Amino acid sequence: MSTTYQLVRNQAALFDFSSEGRFFIKGTDAIEAVNAVIASDLEAIPELKALNTVVLDESGAIQAIVWVLKTEDGIWVLCDPDRHTLLAERLVASAMKCSAEVDDLTEFTMCLAVIGPAAQKIAMAAAGEDVIGIPYLGFEANEQTDTLLCRLGYTGEFEFRFIAANERASDLRAILLEAGAEYGLEIGEVSDLPLLMLEMRSLSQREHIPEGTNPIQAGLHWMVDFQKENYPGHDAVHARKADPGRKALMLQFETVTPPVGDQTVRIDQQDVGRCVCVAFSPTLGKTIALAYVDAALAWVSVVFDVAGLDARAVSAPLFITKTAASPQ
């Protein structure tokens, strides 16, 4: 078990997300400009709320998974580091068609995140008692830390992100580490997050979603507003609802050691899918996997064969986290 895993599941870890893309879209048509790019409907949510959604190409394939934060003055869009250039191009092209302007603030801002069951208490110690009132997908301009404070996350644990100007980096890091000292807060490794996400069936685009996959296949249909019209990939995604081909499915082995070699998923010696990620879950004490299998077989409790081992399809999240089990 890695130190980061233990911290996130039992205490809290501090992560530096500064390499992620951060855009601020402003102007009279800021909502229109962003809405033309994403598959959810930004007009359907109030200010000070966030969306977790996808940007698609015309074939319906996922190009980026993004957070979209709606403020009174404009729209924040956050993305993975390797999607920065692509998203910048899409946002700028959309903004040029209306009265909106895209500010790429990635190089001028930074982001620190506290993740774990103790993260809310740490955020309250650093940013004030009112932080307890921030709901999931909520955020505020926090005066005490001079940051945009967001409650987001994929791990099933509390996650509070602090976005600030670059010059605040050292001070903010010190404030958070001091606030978290009594809770055992330590620096976490971003590379350990995909496993923590997978246990909740939150998907890392880099680790869990092959290029060309659409949201129906990935099980991310909840990131799409199927009542919305006129976004890239609309027709293709609707067509995939009836014929997804293969769909993502969580598998659980009874073994501790992950299977090696061939990751093909089989039933009765017939190839029906493939694992894209296999890992050991310290909390379960078992090996888990994410596989894309023929849609007709993508059902909980079906037992597959992977490298000669039984792999049972299971529902997710795979367990109740300490955050979910604690009084909110």
Where are these regions (language model features)?
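Helix N-cap motif at beta-to-alpha junctions
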Residues: 28-29, 80-85, 117-119, 165-170, ...
